[in-house]
């Protein structure tokens, strides 16, 4: 029998100005999405913005793809 994985919270937080950022960083959701749409892989994005873990990059991209 396959176990159902726990739901994971998105690593996104809105700042005082309403800008959505990857939690614990200054990197915005828009930045991740723009670089992804320009053709960067999740690995390249995580390397470019080293404060964002690869898992968080995948979570943000998944959120973006699911909601567009």
Language model region names:
Residues 23-27:
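Short helix-coil-helix linker/hinge
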Residues 28-68:
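Long, charge-rich, low-complexity alpha-helical segments
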Residues 4-21:
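Short, Lys/Arg-enriched N-terminal segment that forms or immediately precedes the first helix
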């Amino acid at each position: 029998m396959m176990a159902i994985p726990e739901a994971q919270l998105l690593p996104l937080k809105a700042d005082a100005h309403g800008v959505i950022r990857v939690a614990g960083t200054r990197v915005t959701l828009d930045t991740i999405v723009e670089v992804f749409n320009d053709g960067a892989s999740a690995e390249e994005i995580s390397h470019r913005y080293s404060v964002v873990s690869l898992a968080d990059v995948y979570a943000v991209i998944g959120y973006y793809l699911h909601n567009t």
